[in-house]
A protein has these predicted regions:
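ATP-dependent helicase/translocase motor core
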Residues: 1-189
Length: 189
C-alpha cells in the first residue's frame, strides 16, 4: 500500500516503488452521506486517508480554536472517515497556532499543541505556522513520520466490574503521533 524510502540504493526496484507513492490533498472533502459538511483539507497517501485538517484564517475572524470546536462539535466521530485509526491525525491550523489529536470522541476530544514553542516565532515571509507546510507536510517527511514515529500502544487499566464483583483488565489502544517539539528534538540528534 505504501513504499517507504529505501535505506540504501542497492535495490533499484524498491527505489522505483518508493517514487510511485502519491501524496495528494483534497480540499473541501465531503465525508458524509447524511449532510453536506466538508473538511477543509484531507491528505491521502496512495488513496489512504492519513491526515485531516480544519484551516482557519484570522482575516475571516477565526483561529485554530474555531477548528478545534468544529472537530469536537460539528464532526460526528461515528462517520466512517473519523473512526479511530482510520486517520493518523486531525489538525486544527490557524495563522498563528496548530493543534492536533489522534482520536475524535466528540466534546471530550483532547487536542494538543503542535507548535514550535509556546508561541510560534514571527515568520517574515508568511504565517507563523509555515513550518507545518514547509517541513512536516513534505512527502518524504510524511512517509518518514509514518514509518518511524507513528505507532499504536495498547494500555491496560484496572477497573472494578460491580456485576461480576471483581477487578478486570480493560485494554484500549492509543494512537501516538509525535508533537512538533518531539520531532524537532529527534531530528536535531
Amino acid at each position: 500500500l505504501v513504499y517507504f524510502q529505501p535505506k540504501s540504493g542497492l535495490n533499484p526496484e524498491h527505489q522505483e516503488l518508493f517514487k510511485k507513492n502519491r501524496l495528494i490533498t483534497v480540499r473541501q472533502l465531503k465525508y458524509s452521506k447524511h449532510n453536506e459538511n466538508s473538511i477543509d483539507m484531507g491528505i491521502f497517501i496512495n488513496g489512504i486517508p492519513i491526515m485531516m485538517m480544519e484551516l482557519k484564517n484570522t482575516l475571516t475572524g477565526q483561529d485554530h480554536n474555531d477548528g478545534i470546536r468544529q472537530w469536537k462539535f460539528d464532526r460526528d466521530p461515528k462517520e466512517p472517515l473519523f473512526k479511530f485509526k482510520r486517520n493518523l491525525v486531525y489538525f486544527s491550523v490557524g495563522n498563528e497556532k496548530v493543534s492536533m489529536t489522534t482520536r475524535l470522541i466528540g466534546s471530550k476530544t483532547r487536542f494538543l499543541p503542535f507548535n514550535k514553542d509556546i508561541e510560534n516565532p514571527v515568520n517574515k515571509r508568511g504565517h507563523k505556522t509555515h513550518y507545518l507546510w514547509d517541513d512536516i507536510l513534505q512527502p518524504n517527511f510524511v512517509l518518514d513520520l509514518i514509518e518511524n514515529y507513528v505507532h499504536i500502544r495498547t494500555e491496560t487499566e484496572k477497573v472494578y466490574d460491580p456485576q461480576r464483583e471483581k477487578v478486570l483488565d480493560k485494554k484500549s489502544d492509543v494512537l501516538i503521533f509525535p508533537r512538533y517539539h518531539q520531532l524537532n528534538v529527534i531530528r536535531r540528534l
